[in-house]
């Protein structure tokens, strides 16, 4: 008899970001012989997955409101749908992403169904949820704690994320690091370059948390001739004036790009100076392309300093500038570090490897 699994996630199941992670988890489940009931806004079209979600919900009526209201409202809708499905059917297990799991996990606890919480970030303590908690419809911190408590396993993107849970008292046996994945055949080094200009990519939301101010400060200090900094990602509204003030020179503000591969393949290195990041998937994609990586511990990148990348403190802009200059002047070193980063991805972070880790984590 095949296992029947309820999977809850309110996204549209595109091929980007967390949507892609969800797709890979669904493929892993069906490939492992499970039948999946999916509560989401998108039908992935995967054999063995029954779409029981809604492409339009009542929360769409408030889609004009700020993200901080609209997205939690959608999560509440699918949390309630998940609870109804959990109450109606006898599932072998329930898998839900954080902030969508509370009500279905309560039902599952009553029925004795094991629950698995997929988490994309850090424990809520030390994040905006603690320092500036959002009102309803966001979950309260006590509700987040209840999700943690009801989960049999919490599936985490990095060791850094796991450490944040351990520091806050969660037992190690509840925490499973499954990492992330990347299409290593697609994200591969370029066979040739159009020119020899030294380029660094910043790929991610352009916001304070990702360290864009520090990146630009280091870039200006480095002042590398014949070079470009490519900034790929949506800009936070609060940084509009900052971007306008830095819109000239050798900084290219490219906005959000559905296809980042052509830009990565024109670069030599990548940089992200994140705080409180679960796992920066864009860094895995850049590393898979053979880019030398400069990042912080908080990015979640599997770093061996000066072997497969460079680990830095985000405020050490003078040191970061020196690294940029060093990689420009020593292209052989840049290529060597980039190749080591790609090997790390090939060995541990293909989507196939990710699927195996995920299946092992939810096997109990």
Show the residue positions of the predicted features.
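Acceptor-binding helix/loop patch of EC 2.4 sugar-transfer enzymes
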Residues: 58-69, 115-145
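Membrane-proximal helix-turn-helix segments that form the acceptor-binding/catalytic region
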Residues: 80-87, 102-103, 123, 134-154
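Carbohydrate-associated surface elements
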Residues: 160, 181
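Conserved donor-binding/catalytic core segment of Leloir-type glycosyltransferases
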Residues: 191-210, 216-221, 230
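Aromatic "clamp/platform" in nucleotide-sugar-dependent glycosyltransferases that forms part
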Residues: 256, 275
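Short hydrophobic beta-strand element within catalytic cores of glycosyltransferases
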Residues: 292-295
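Conserved acidic donor-binding segment of nucleotide-sugar-dependent glycosyltransferases
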Residues: 297, 303-306, 310-317, 326-331
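A short, well-ordered alpha-helix in the C-terminal region of glycosyltransferases
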Residues: 326, 333-347, 354-357
């Amino acid at each position: 008899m095949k296992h029947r699994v309820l999977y809850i996630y309110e996204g549209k199941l595109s091929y980007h970001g967390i949507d892609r992670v969800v797709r890979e988890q669904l493929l892993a489940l069906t490939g492992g012989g499970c039948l999946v009931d999916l509560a989401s806004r998108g039908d992935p079209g995967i054999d063995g997955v029954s779409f029981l979600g809604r492409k339009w919900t009542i929360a769409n009526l408030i889609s004009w409101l700020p993200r901080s209201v609209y997205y939690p409202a959608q999560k509440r809708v699918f949390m309630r749908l998940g609870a109804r499905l959990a109450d109606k059917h006898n599932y072998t297990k329930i898998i839900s992403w954080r902030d969508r799991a509370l009500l279905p996990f309560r039902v599952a606890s009553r029925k004795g169904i094991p629950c698995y919480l997929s988490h994309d970030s850090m424990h809520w303590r030390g994040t905006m949820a603690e320092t500036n908690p959002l009102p309803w419809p966001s979950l309260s911190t006590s509700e987040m704690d209840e999700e943690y408590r009801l989960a049999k396993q919490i599936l985490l993107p990095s060791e850094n994320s796991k450490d944040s849970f351990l520091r806050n008292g969660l037992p190690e046996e509840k925490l499973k690091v499954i990492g992330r994945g990347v299409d290593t055949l697609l994200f591969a080094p370029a066979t040739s370059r159009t020119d020899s200009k030294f380029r660094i990519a910043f790929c991610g939301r352009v916001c304070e948390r990702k360290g864009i101010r520090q990146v630009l400060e280091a870039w200006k200090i480095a002042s590398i001739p014949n070079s470009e900094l490519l900034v790929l990602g949506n800009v936070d509204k609060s940084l509009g004036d900052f971007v306008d003030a830095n819109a000239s020179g050798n900084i290219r503000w490219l906005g959000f790009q559905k296809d980042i591969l052509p830009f990565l393949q024109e670069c030599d290195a990548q940089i992200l100076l994140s705080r409180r990041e679960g796992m920066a998937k864009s860094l895995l994609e850049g590393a898979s392309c053979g880019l030398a990586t400069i990042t912080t511990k908080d990015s979640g990148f599997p770093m061996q300093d000066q072997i497969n990348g460079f680990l830095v403190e985000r405020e050490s802009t003078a040191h970061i500038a020196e690294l940029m200059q060093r990689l420009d002047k020593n292209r052989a070193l840049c290529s060597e570090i980039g190749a080591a980063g790609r090997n790390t991805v090939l060995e541990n972070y293909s989507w196939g490897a990710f699927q195996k880790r995920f299946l092992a984590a939810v096997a109990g």
